[in-house]
Amino acid sequence: MCPVENKWLKVGQKGAGPGARSSHAMTVVGNKVYCFGGELKPTIHIDNDLYVFDLETQEWSIAPATGEAPFPCFGVSMVTIGSTIYVYGGRDDKRRYNGLHSYDTETNEWKLLAPVEEGLPGRSYHSMAGDDRKVYVFGGVTAKGRVNTLHAYDVVDQKWVEYPAAGEACKGRGAPGLVVVEGRIWVLFGFDGNELGDIHCFDLASEQWKAVETTGDVPAARSVFPAVSYGKYIVIYGGEEEPHELMHMGAGKMSGEVYQLDTETLVWERIVCGNEEEKPSQRGWCAFTKAVKDGEEGLLVHGGNSPTNERLDDLVFWGFSHLNVN
């Protein structure tokens, strides 16, 4: 297929930011990026500060906070609905798991919405996505192993909703891509002891699962990678294509490629993102979110683990304006 050209932008950073880390999470409220959790060394948590990056001034700060914050953790996920951030899961170095917390960006208050004892089994390296009412949680690693369950937290009714199980065809997995597109939840790839290359889709209206076969420039199996939606398209970047023999303690084979999937035609296309010297380091285990930078919507990525097992501290942006869309 004919590759589409686009380029990465390295975003300048000022102020006291999160620094080098991996297994953390990011989300956006307005022109502010919020970052939480992570590890600098494998399986050792860092802090529970909530870092804020202003996309206009390009400066980091630490959010003022009251209330009951999540404890320091890694393998955590977060999404935004309205002006509220929802943070779920993640574990510390003693394998304690966080429940579901919210952070109100207008009042700067943390709240514990659902402790682990009253909600889902504690987990890390799960994936989250959201719409205007629900926070969706799929998969992850619990104390009993990797799971393939799908739940949602209804922010209006303030309760968990359990959906039908994904079935044996969709193995329990950690760190898949999870994206909501036009009333359907897409589960892409992940890790079950091996990197997975399958895709599954859940229709929210019919509550039916189905396995999805795709064509085109199909990406290699992978996990711990950014995945976001853009209209009817899913965009993925990077990830770990092969695990290290030491698993989490080492860095496996990392990717630096960008792909787009048309969810109607089910055709993948690999995107050429400038010259090799213009690309950011290959990585996985990074924080990511959709964001608008200088009027353009795109993928914003912070940190992650590099092929040398060194944690990264850069902030890079990839705009959607040159995607091959129709």
Swiss-Prot record:
Superkingdom of origin: Eukaryota
Annotated protein name in UniProt: Thiohydroximate-O-sulfate sulfur/sulfate-lyase (nitrile-forming) NSP5
Catalytic activity as recorded in UniProt: a (Z)-N-(sulfonatooxy)alkanimidothioate = a nitrile + sulfur + sulfate; (Z)-phenyl-N-(sulfonatooxy)methanimidothioate = phenylacetonitrile + sulfur + sulfate; (Z)-N-(sulfonatooxy)prop-2-enimidothioate = but-3-enenitrile + sulfur + sulfate; (Z)-(indol-3-yl)-N-(sulfonatooxy)methanimidothioate = (indol-3-yl)acetonitrile + sulfur + sulfate
Disruption phenotype: No visible phenotype.
UniProt key word Lyase: yes
EC number: 4.8.1.5
Binding-site list for Fe(2+): 240, 248
Source species taxonomy: Eukaryota, Viridiplantae, Streptophyta, Embryophyta, Tracheophyta
Active site: 91 (proton donor), 146 (proton donor)
UniProt enzyme class: lyase
Tissue specificity remark: Mainly expressed in seedlings, and, to a lower extent, in roots and leaves, but barely in seeds.
GO biological process, one term: nitrile biosynthetic process
Entry annotated with the keyword Metal-binding: yes
Cofactor: Fe(2+)
Additional remarks: The proton donor differs depending on substrates.
Keywords noted in UniProt: Iron, Kelch repeat, Lyase, Metal-binding, Repeat
GO cellular component, one term: plastid
UniProt activity-regulation remark: The presence of Fe(2+) supports lyase activity in a dose-dependent manner with both benzylglucosinolate and 2-propenylglucosinolate as substrates. More active at pH 7.4 than at pH 6.
Functional note: Specifier protein that contributes to constitutive and herbivore-induced simple nitrile formation. Promotes simple nitriles, but not epithionitrile or thiocyanate formation. Converts allylglucosinolate (allyl-GSL), 2-propenylglucosinolate (sinigrin), indol-3-ylmethylglucosinolate (glucobrassicin), benzylisothiocyanate and benzylglucosinolate (glucotropaeolin) to their corresponding simple nitriles in the presence of myrosinase. Catalyzes mainly the conversion of benzylisothiocyanate when benzylglucosinolate is used as the initial substrate of myrosinase.
Organism: Arabidopsis thaliana (Mouse-ear cress)
